Structure formats: C-alpha cells, structure tokens
Amino acid sequence: MSVRERRAVVATGLIAGLALTATVASCGASQHDSKQVVLQIGAIPDQNPEKLNRLYGTLSEELSEKLDVPVRYAPVSNYAAAVSAFRTGSLDLVWFGGLTGVQARLQTPGARVLAQRDIDAEFTSVFIANGASGLRPFTSADQLVELKGRRLAFGSASSTSGRLMPQFFMGENGVKPEDLAGGGPGFSGSHDATIAVVQSGAYEVGALNEQVWRSNVADERVDPGKVSVIWRTPPYVDYHWVVRPGLDERFGDGFTNKLQSALLDLSADTENGATILELFGAERFIPAKDEDYTM
C-alpha cells in the first residue's frame, strides 16, 4: 500500500469517525494561570495511568531541561477531555491519536502537527480473541465476517487504533456494529483494558493498538493460552504531537521550533531519552506535518 493510499484510508476513516464521534466532553484538566509561563503537556489516556504518569513525568523533566522552561504534565480523564483541554488552552502540547488530533486541529485554528514516532507512519491494530471463542487466525480480511454475532470490545470510542480503524476495516468487509452480539460493541476505555476483558472472557474479541499489545506480551501480562492475535490491519498513520499556536509569543521567538527539535533529538543514548523512547515503544521521533493526517 502506497503512502498516498495509506493516507486515503486513514482520511476516510477519520471522516467517518468525526461523523460518529460526539463533539466534546467536559475537560478533566484545570486551566492554568495565563500569567504563569508553564508549558502544559498532555496525552490521550490510552493506557494505564501509572505508565502514563511515568512516561510523561520523565518527558516533562527532559523538555524542561532542554527548553529551560517549567513543563508540567496534566492528565485528563478521557479522549474527549484531551481535545477540550487543548482547545481551551489548558494544554499546550498533546500526544493525540489520528482521530483526536484531527478533532483538536479543527477546533483550534493555527494548531499544527509537530512530530510522530518512527512507527506511526505505518501503524497497525490487531484483533485478539479469547481461546474459548473458537476463532482462529484469519488469513484474509474477508474472514472478518466471522465476527458477526460475537461479543467484541473496542477501547475508547475516540481511539483511532482501538476503534476507528478496526471498525473501518470491519465495515469494508461487511460487518456493521449492529451485527455484533448485543447490537453493538463494548468499550473498555483503553488498549490494555481491552486485553484484560478479552483475556478474562468477558468479551470474545477485542481490537487494539498493536504496539500496546506487543508491550504487554513482552511484559508477560498476556496469557498466550487464553488470548491471541487473529488478524492484523493494513497500515495507516496514527499518533502524533500537536502544538497550540501562540507559544512563540509566550515563551519567546522560535520556541515552537525549539520544542520540535527537543522531541526529535530524544535519543536512547541518554538515560531519560532511553526511558522515554522505550515507554513510547519507538526508536526515535520523526518530523510530521498536518498533511500526513488529511487527504
């Protein structure tokens, strides 16, 4: 699949997701004092809070040292809250998925994409199944039709890799949400929670971010006797950093470019850099632009 085709696929999915997703939930991060020059960073809560606090706490320390400004991580309660906090100015820099990043930029004129991981240009989701479901690995996408009548869990409704793109590929192969058991999917709230509900047998099938799946397997949080991958999606573009406009006015000329460079310069050669990149499941960050997430 060419880069143009991948962008077309994700753009089609994003358009569908924007039509299906509720506009905005209330913000979980408190708005900071506009007189206090603090760079507020955030992220969609796609994994367990303990891991996110460690990751973004370490990143805040690293960025503060490199940029010589106070940097604070402000967690939010859900995906919509991340978009809302970015729109209102409570967050200056946010790690979004494909769908939430588009939502954030549409609601915040002048916001722009700064960077993505080396794995985000060709990202994939996986469908996993509980062993008792009787489902075996699919050899082609048209076998997704076997999901009809099954109990299936997505992560967040606003997740690109945990709902939007898996649902897009299901639809391409004749499976509508109402075809699932109970008349629709369940929502676990995050990728690691999807693993948990499928492994426990609460759901027969789940769809999630492949990087989180691999990380949980490596950390031995997955019982291979109870749950396994049955299908991997084609690649698409996904996660990325989005920055608000006006940071140069608050922090000084050229600050936004310095911020981008600080992200791109993260290296496994330093202790903090190695920790950050490992927790992100990446080897490095690479430049990205708005056009990567549109037609």
Regions found by a protein language model. Give the residues of each.
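Bacterial signal peptide processing site
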Residues: 24, 28-31
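An extracytoplasmic/periplasmic, membrane-proximal ligand-sensing/linker region
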Residues: 36-42, 47-58, 236, 242-243, ...
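Short, glycine-/small- and polar/acidic-enriched structural segments
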Residues: 33-140, 210
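Short helix-initiation/N-cap motifs at beta->coil->alpha
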Residues: 73-84, 97-99, 177-196, 235
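Short beta-strand->loop
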Residues: 111-120, 180-184, 217-235
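A conserved helix-loop-strand patch within extracytoplasmic ligand-binding domains
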Residues: 117-175, 179
